[in-house]
């Protein structure tokens, strides 16, 4: 029977390089019931997906058997505990070892090399006693080796477990130099005992004790720099943790009490004064204020809060006194979820890391074989044993599996942290990698490119009315309606401080509008057909309404007491940054497709406003995923939506991006969550992903290039041609800097700016043969709409134009008519072809003289 699958995190100790993490991963995969395991060298952690018969105890035992330590993480731990884990004291420990090593190394190097290389005076005690010099070097080198014994313990343990690591290479290199030098020292003793001072001095030059000590010290320098740099990669997470308030002021038993923030429970009432941070997620009960949410969303403009508004932990109350009810506390707050998401993204592996993983698994054994082969080759060629040994040691100490192992995770860690800082959350490392490969972005119109709620855009009063009187009538009539368009009108009236009158006998007229009595007068509001049926709508107002409809707006006509009051146009307004976002995506070589359930006319109007390239209109919610699937034939697709109504499409896409998530950051369908409602963050997420990918490629190139060039040089490849041999000490110095360079390069991502273009040229956009560009759609719509113009004599006033317009609109096949008194003509938009003679006869029948029709 298969048990319930569970995901658990473990802290892992003893790992020093990529070979270690690869060995731990293999060991855990061998436990029956383990489905998936990811080991992070950067955070010294492991995430395991397993079911029965696997248990946490068995997993820890497997890690222990592999020569390392593991323990389950405390999932419910406080943020302070998590921060303590991130703030490792490893750099401090390494620094202590480094200082002690340098203190011993300096006198060692003075005695062993100072007088030879720089002519420094030799202390009198060593002036004519080579054996004393040798014993002095042995003593100091032994002390350095004891101080850095962890290399030997870790290296030997991993070697005996069949998984040699970087420490194995370091310990073998320094131990070989130490053992060989000790053997030479015995030869010196023998020569000194026999009185052969010249031979003893000759053997002194064959000592490599300073190399053994220098190798360990330089590697420790590299480890220290690496540890400090690795600590900086978690700065983003630590800064998020620092945002959480330590205390909260709650109301219990009618009194205010200050308690630790983690002790607030759901349902508690808490108060927040101006200048204080909000301790937990909640809902405002009373009070009004502006809240700075930039810490969570990256949005610098404060958000107004009123009773009923949601507030989030770690946001700053600026100027009002708020009383709130706690809705999400502890690990459930938005801040905690963001921190967990960044940690999870850093703990997972990107597909690109598999290359380094494969190489790391065989890297150390291969290097050991190369070192042995190099030493043997030089011995066979007739070179002295000391020379051959130096080449083998150089190969061992210059090789660096750490650079390979850190190339990807450090970039992922810094990248995901920078994303969180700017309100862009990547759920996994795969999502962070995949987003940058996006070729086609599909954007849902409503709520993504537009505000998502209708707003009043135009107020066109008829004769005898002004804007305020028309808006008051409309608000009075719509006050009892639940329609979204009605809500837009009542909201506009409220913003204009207009008080609506009481509507009596309210009645909804499905498909047409509403009716009611206001101040004893009959009032109606709705579409053009409703007012036409009452004989109220005149041609001029109808033409104005059609013009508004042509702009993608919904015209609502209002009348009272049988008299037309005017038109109020309502539309879902395009977001202020949508046009700029589309422009940015296009400049990055990304195709944009707008997906909407709206009719073609409205969709094309919006597309024209923002410059989107392609439009798919009249799409039912359930069909959005099918559209995404078709687009995937042409390239990698990212779907952008609200994460709820678009869930199937988000799941179908290569990358699902949920926009404007706010407090709901744990949307299951999305791979990337954008905290703000800004479409520009879509471009920012792609831009950040591309920079992270570029950084990973640079790191991997450096790691492979360094080892591919360094190992042959260390083995002596330059000796036959240039007579250049690499001293083991220089090899150790190169190794110590390689990992530091990789981590430092990743830290450059901290300078990421969301609106800064990526370096390099963008790839040309993919072609979408299955879709017609929006510009062509608009052009074709304009071209295919048949138009005819008839020139008319005899029109004297607006009454005449209205008479002509009414006569022409009565013809079958005529969609709309625009009559110009000044130009003495009428322009007809036709649904079907209408004969010129029919048009001219209609004008004659109306009492006017048509001169030409074309």
What residue ranges belong to the model's regions?
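Membrane-embedded alpha-helical bundles of multi-pass transporters
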Residues: 117-131, 160, 179, 418, ...
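Hydrophobic alpha-helical transmembrane segments
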Residues: 142-151, 158-161, 175, 211-240, ...
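Transmembrane helix-loop-helix hairpins at the membrane interface
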Residues: 92-247, 358, 459, 723-728, ...
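Conserved ATP-binding TGD loop and adjacent catalytic N/P-domain core of P-type ATPases
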Residues: 22, 438, 518-520, 544, ...
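P-type ATPase nucleotide-binding
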Residues: 456, 460-588, 600, 612-628
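Flexible metal-binding regulatory segments at protein termini and peripheral loops
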Residues: 1-132, 255-256, 340-348, 753-854
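Juxtamembrane coupling segments of multi-pass membrane pumps/enzymes
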Residues: 82, 188, 197-200, 213-274, ...
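Conserved cytosolic catalytic loops of P-type ATPases
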Residues: 32-51, 56, 61, 206-209, ...
């Amino acid at each position: 029977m298969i048990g319930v699958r569970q995901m658990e995190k473990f802290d892992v100790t003893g790992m020093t390089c990529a070979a270690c993490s690869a060995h731990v991963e293999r060991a855990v995969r061998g436990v029956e019931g383990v489905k998936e395991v990811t080991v992070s060298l950067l955070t010294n952690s492991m995430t395991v997906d397993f079911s029965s018969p696997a248990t946490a105890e068995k997993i820890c035992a497997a890690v222990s058997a592999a020569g390392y330590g593991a323990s389950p993480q405390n999932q419910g731990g406080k943020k302070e505990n998590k921060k303590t884990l991130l703030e490792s004291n490893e750099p401090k420990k390494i620094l202590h070892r480094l200082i002690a090593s340098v203190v011993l190394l300096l006198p060692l190097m003075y005695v062993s090399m100072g007088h030879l290389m720089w002519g420094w005076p030799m202390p009198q005690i060593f002036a004519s006693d080579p054996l004393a010099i040798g014993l002095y070097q042995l003593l100091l080198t032994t002390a350095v080796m004891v101080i850095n014994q962890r290399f030997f313990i870790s290296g030997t343990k991993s070697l005996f477990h069949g998984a040699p690591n970087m420490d194995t290479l370091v310990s073998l290199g320094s131990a070989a130099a130490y053992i060989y030098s000790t053997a030479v020292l015995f030869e010196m003793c023998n020569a000194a005992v026999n009185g052969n001072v010249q031979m003893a001095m000759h053997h002194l030059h064959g000592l490599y004790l300073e190399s053994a000590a220098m190798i360990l010290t330089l590697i420790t320098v590299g480890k220290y720099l690496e540890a400090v740099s690795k600590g900086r990669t978690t700065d983003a997470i630590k800064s998020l943790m620092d945002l959480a308030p330590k205390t909260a002021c709650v109301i219990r038993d009618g009194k205010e009490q200050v308690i630790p923030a983690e002790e607030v429970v759901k349902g508690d009432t808490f108060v927040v004064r101006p200048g204080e941070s909000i301790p937990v997620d909640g809902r405002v009960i009373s009070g009004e204020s502006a809240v700075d949410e930039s810490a969570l969303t990256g949005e610098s403009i404060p958000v107004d809060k009123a009773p009923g508004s949601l507030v989030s932990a770690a946001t700053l109350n600026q100027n009002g006194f708020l009383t709130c009810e706690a809705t999400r506390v502890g690990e459930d707050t938005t801040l905690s979820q963001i921190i967990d998401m960044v940690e999870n993204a850093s703990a997972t592996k990107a597909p690109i890391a598999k290359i380094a993983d494969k190489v790391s698994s065989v890297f150390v054994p291969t290097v050991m074989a190369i070192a042995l082969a190099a030493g043997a080759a030089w011995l066979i060629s007739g070179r002295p044993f000391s020379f051959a040994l130096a080449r083998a040691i150089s190969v061992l100490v210059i090789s660096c599996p750490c650079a390979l192992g850190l190339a990807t995770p450090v970039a992922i860690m810094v990248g995901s942290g920078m994303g969180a800082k700017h309100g862009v959350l990547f759920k996994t490392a795969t999502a962070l990698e995949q987003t940058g490969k996006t070729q086609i972005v599909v954007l849902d119109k409503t709520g993504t490119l537009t505000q998502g709620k209708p707003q009043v855009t135009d107020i066109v009063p008829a004769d005898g009315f002004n804007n305020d009187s028309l808006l008051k009538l409309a608000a009075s009539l719509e006050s009892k309606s639940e329609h979204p368009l009605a809500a837009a009108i009542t909201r506009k009236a409220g913003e204009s401080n207009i008080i609506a009158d009481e509507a009596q006998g309210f009645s909804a007229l499905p498909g047409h509008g509403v009716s009611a009595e206001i101040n004893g007068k009959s009032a109606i509001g709705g579409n053009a057909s409703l007012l036409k049926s009452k004989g109220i709508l005149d041609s001029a107002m109808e033409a104005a309404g059609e013009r508004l409809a042509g702009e993608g707006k919904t015209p609502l006509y209002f009348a009272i007491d049988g008299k037309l009051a005017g038109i109020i146009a309502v539309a879902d307004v395009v977001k202020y940054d949508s046009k700029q976002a589309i422009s940015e995506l296009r400049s990055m070589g990304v195709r944009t497709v707008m997906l909407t359930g709206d009719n073609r006319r409205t969709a094309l109007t919006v597309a024209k406003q923002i410059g989107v390239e392609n439009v798919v209109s009249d799409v039912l919610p359930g069909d959005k995923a099918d559209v995404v699937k078709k687009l995937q034939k042409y390239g990698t697709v990212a779907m952008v939506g609200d994460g709820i109504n678009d869930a199937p499409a988000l799941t179908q896409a290569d990358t699902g991006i949920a926009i404007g998530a706010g407090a709901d950051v744990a949307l299951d369908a999305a791979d990337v969550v954008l905290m703000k409602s800004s479409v520009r963050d879509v471009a920012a997420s792609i831009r950040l992903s591309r920079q992270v990918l570029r950084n990973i490629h640079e790191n991997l190139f450096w790691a492979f290039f360094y080892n591919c060039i360094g190992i042959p040089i260390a083995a002596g490849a330059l000796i036959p041609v240039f007579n250049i041999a690499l001293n083991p000490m220089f090899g150790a110095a190169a190794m110590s800097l390689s990992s530091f360079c990789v981590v430092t390069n990743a830290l450059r991502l901290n300078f990421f700016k969301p609106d800064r273009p990526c370096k390099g040229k963008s790839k040309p956009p993919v072609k979408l043969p299955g879709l017609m560009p929006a510009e062509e759609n608009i052009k074709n719509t304009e071209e295919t709409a048949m138009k005819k113009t008839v020139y008319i004599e005899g029109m004297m006033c607006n009454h005449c134009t209205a008479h002509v317009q009414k006569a022409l609109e009565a013809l079958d096949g005529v969609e709309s008519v625009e009559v110009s008194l000044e130009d003495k003509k009428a322009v007809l938009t036709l649904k079907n072809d209408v004969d010129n003679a029919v048009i001219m006869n209609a004008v004659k029948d109306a009492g006017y003289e048509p001169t030409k029709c074309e």
